[in-house]
């Protein structure tokens, strides 16, 4: 049994005319049914493209191209859950360094042959997005199920951005409270929360108006 988040026709395609025409660039990728693919081009060396490939028959893995996608070579069997993660980010300075978003972030320093976890002490897990400062590759912003975190030392210490009230909502409902109805939402990893639709003060809604439902 294999879960694959794709189907016939899945693969990588390349355009050199701004999207007017496309060609497949799948030489070296698995010849079986392919699912979700995370891909990034190395700013340090644009000839290099990395791809993390979900595929049937346990043939997925981490792939590397050194000729702008014309051919691919499997570096390792590293994959994540294609239905929730599978995003990668190449370091803008070091062409051999790539970060994988997953429950816990991981990093390769040898072009995908081996990986180790990035330090995430006092940080929420389930990572999905990353920005690496092109002028200082120790400075990152990472988006995860718990919000946005910043580090200036490659993950040794993290700063949570408390002024950005972001989370993932799955379901929203309202009640019949008066004078203002409450809004409730079920979130990913962060309970079900509720709060008023309006308040009787000139400052408007603030974080203290929200509560965890029981």
What is each stretch, according to the model?
Residues 1-214:
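Beta-propeller blade termini and top-face loops
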